[in-house]
């Protein structure tokens, strides 16, 4: 893809998300979603092959269905309330339909089937955009309408997303699919707290984006797409093995890493609202994710596969890939726990 075309498409993706973030008019929000969806498809098809074509088609069909449902719910809301302004939604049917449309865009269960398939069919760089930037716009709208959302529906979707994300990632050897199931789980955590404390959901999203960006960049730097290729990291890129270890454990939510902060604060907030069963189930399902993250860390950093002398010497040569953003991302993804009191004060 030519640089000028890539810049135009990328700026359209960013502009679409910004329109959604800063609009208070339902029609402009819908326009922003459409701009974002149509501009992201060429990025998904950047490496033109049948698998990328299939992934882009699946993404388009899912997002188009969600957009159609969103527009229908906006019209129902307009007929009931008489205005286009984003505020509390008086009609329960419109509220439920908007929630379903947004969760379909986010990839929450039971609308999660497209996420692993699309992520696996595209490149690592496109997958990074899909699992980070593309989550911002739907979550921002869910944040704005959180007082009107059907709490039982959202909590049911949240707990099923955590179960699906945990069980789905257990048997995977493809890193992109593992990160896709990880995304489904994290979206479930955000949906669970959205009804009670939407600010915590935004905090969770911020930390999730930093951790996922760092993980994707490490995988791109080492050209790893499977657990087998990741097992050669210690021989080819010895400095990256401990970094991948820390990021994986942070994604799993182990203290004292940054990934522990949102899980801790969400469980604490739910217990404050007299919910006991929900946070207990969430803590148990988190163990499923922790298992496959730990398996990845074992493969990457705790085992050394047989290698030739040429492979062992490879890490000493200067790499051509840029890693400027990697350092701040890894620091923020692993060392934010001391800032927890300050983050808690933001609620």
From Swiss-Prot:
The catalytic activity of this protein is classed by the Enzyme Commission as 7.1.1.2
- Per UniProt, the enzyme's principal EC class comes to translocase
For this chain's UniProt record, which GO biological process terms are given? mitochondrial electron transport, NADH to ubiquinone; mitochondrial respiratory chain complex I assembly
Q: Which Gene Ontology cellular-component terms appear in the entry?
A: mitochondrial inner membrane
Q: Which keywords does this chain's UniProt record carry?
A: Electron transport, Membrane, Mitochondrion, Mitochondrion inner membrane, NAD, Respiratory chain, Translocase, Transmembrane, Transmembrane helix, Transport, Ubiquinone
Please give the chief subcellular localization of this protein.
mitochondrion
Give the reactions, separated by semicolons, that this protein catalyses.
Answer: a ubiquinone + NADH + 5 H(+)(in) = a ubiquinol + NAD(+) + 4 H(+)(out)
Spell out the disulfide connections.
none
The protein's location, in the record's own words, is: Mitochondrion inner membrane
* Membrane-traversing stretches: 5-22, 26-45, 60-80, 96-116, 122-142, 153-173, 178-198, 200-220, 237-257, 274-294, 325-345
Question: What domain of life is recorded for the organism?
Answer: Eukaryota
Q: Name one GO molecular function term.
A: NADH dehydrogenase (ubiquinone) activity
Pfam families named among the record's database cross-references: NADH_dehy_S2_C, Proton_antipo_M
Membrane topology, as annotated, equals: Multi-pass membrane protein
Coiled-coil region(s) at which residues? none
InterPro entries linked: Complex_I_Subunit_2, NADH_DH_su2_C, NADH_UbQ_OxRdtase_chain2, ND/Mrp_TM
The job of this chain, per UniProt, is described as: Core subunit of the mitochondrial membrane respiratory chain NADH dehydrogenase (Complex I) which catalyzes electron transfer from NADH through the respiratory chain, using ubiquinone as an electron acceptor. Essential for the catalytic activity and assembly of complex I.
Q: Which family does it belong to?
A: Belongs to the complex I subunit 2 family.
Quaternary form?
Core subunit of respiratory chain NADH dehydrogenase (Complex I) which is composed of 45 different subunits. Interacts with TMEM242.
Q: This chain belongs to which protein, by name? A: NADH-ubiquinone oxidoreductase chain 2
Query: What species was this sequence derived from?
Result: Ailuropoda melanoleuca (Giant panda)
- Its gene name is MT-ND2
């Amino acid at each position: 893809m030519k640089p000028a075309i890539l810049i135009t498409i990328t700026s359209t993706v960013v502009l679409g998300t910004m329109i959604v973030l800063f609009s208070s008019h339902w029609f402009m929000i819908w326009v922003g979603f459409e701009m974002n969806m149509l501009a992201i498809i060429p990025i998904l098809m950047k490496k033109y092959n049948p698998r990328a074509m299939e992934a882009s088609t699946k993404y388009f069909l899912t997002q188009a269905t969600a957009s159609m449902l969103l527009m229908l719910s906006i019209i129902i809301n307009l007929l009931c309330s008489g205005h286009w302004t984003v505020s509390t939604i008086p009609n329960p049917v419109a509220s439920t339909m908007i929630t379903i449309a947004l969760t379909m865009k986010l990839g929450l269960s039971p609308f999660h089937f497209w996420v692993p398939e699309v992520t696996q069919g595209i490149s690592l760089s496109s997958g990074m955009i899909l699992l980070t930037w593309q989550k911002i716009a739907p979550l921002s709208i869910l944040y704005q309408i959180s007082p009107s959302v059907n709490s039982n529906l959202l909590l049911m979707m949240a707990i099923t997303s955590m179960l699906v994300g945990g069980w789905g990632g257990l048997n995977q050897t493809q890193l992109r699919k593992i990160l896709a199931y990880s995304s489904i789980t994290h979206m479930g955590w955000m949906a669970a707290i959205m009804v009670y404390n939407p600010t915590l959901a935004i905090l969770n999203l911020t930390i999730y984006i930093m951790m996922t960006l760092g993980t994707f960049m490490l995988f791109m730097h080492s050209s790893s797409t499977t657990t087998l290729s990741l097992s050669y990291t210690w021989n080819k890129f010895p400095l990256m093995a401990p970094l991948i270890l820390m990021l994986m454990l942070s994604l799993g939510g182990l203290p004292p890493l940054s990934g522990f902060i949102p899980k801790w604060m969400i469980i604490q907030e739910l217990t404050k609202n007299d919910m006991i069963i929900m946070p207990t189930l969430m803590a148990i399902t988190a163990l499923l994710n922790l298992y496959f993250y730990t398996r990845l860390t074992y493969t990457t950093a705790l085992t050394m596969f047989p290698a030739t002398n040429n492979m062992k010497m490879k890490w000493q040569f200067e790499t051509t890939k840029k890693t400027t953003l990697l350092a701040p991302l890894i620091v923020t993804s692993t060392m934010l726990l001391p800032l927890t009191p300050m983050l808690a004060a933001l609620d």
